[in-house]
Amino acid sequence: MLSPVPVDAVELAEVPDVMPDAMPDDQLMLAYAGGDTGAFDVLYARHEGALFRFVRRLLGIRLAAEVDEVFQETWVRIITARDSFSPQGAAWRTWAFTIAHNLAMDRLRASGRQMVVHVHDDDDEGLDAVQRVSGRLLNGQGQPVDAAHPSAEDAAFWRSAGRRLLACLNELPDDQRAAFLLHHEDGFTVEAMAAALDVGFETVRSRLRYGLKKLRGCMARYLSVLVEGA
């Protein structure tokens, strides 16, 4: 498993005299390592939502009760590893998501895939998920989700489709689910994923291909409605 690689010393780059909100992630992390706690606040605000969503969907239904703990542990690891971060390695976002991925996968392996009683039943969560990936699931056929001004009928359909998508994601093997989320929800390239997860390029492509195929099969009833209505 890949973990942040310590370095003997990190020379803190000079940070341009710009507002923290406009600084790239790597510079913010270097500034934080140099003692600027405000830089960490910007990093947290910028990536809190995406990291939490990734951890929540990767852990899935059976470990929903452990999402907050893994999410908080991710940030603790980021804080404690601040002096080992090097901008010559992976970009900060890739580095941070790798930490979250490794912690979540450790928790999944330790769980033995046993179902946890606590279950999220969040229509907004499902709707958000299906909005993000509907275009990829349709593969150019039909019309992706546009929930800007849905009718009551459309809203009900998409909430139902969203709940189904979350259930389908939960049925994927852990490595395929992680690859799908990183690539299709969070925008990581195959090359970045291979480097971050310390696996081969073709391995990542295979996980994506098989995961997407399974999701399309699992979502077939909903996807057929979209294709027919296009």
Regions found by a protein language model. Name each.
Residues 51, 55, 82, 96, ...:
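Hydrophobic-face residues of short alpha-helical interaction/recognition segments
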Residues 69-76, 90-102:
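Structural recognition of an alpha-helix C-terminal capping motif at a helix-to-coil junction
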Residues 44-45, 52, 63-81, 186:
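Conserved RNAP core-binding helix
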Residues 29, 40-44, 54, 71, ...:
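Amphipathic alpha-helical segments enriched in hydrophobic/aromatic and basic residues
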Residues 1-34, 42-46, 112-182, 188-202, ...:
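Intrinsic, short, N-terminal disordered tails of RNA polymerase sigma-factor systems
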Residues 33-34, 57-62, 73-90, 110-111:
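Sigma70-family region 2
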Residues 38, 90, 187-188:
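Residue-level signal for the short linker/turn that defines the boundary of a DNA-recognition helix
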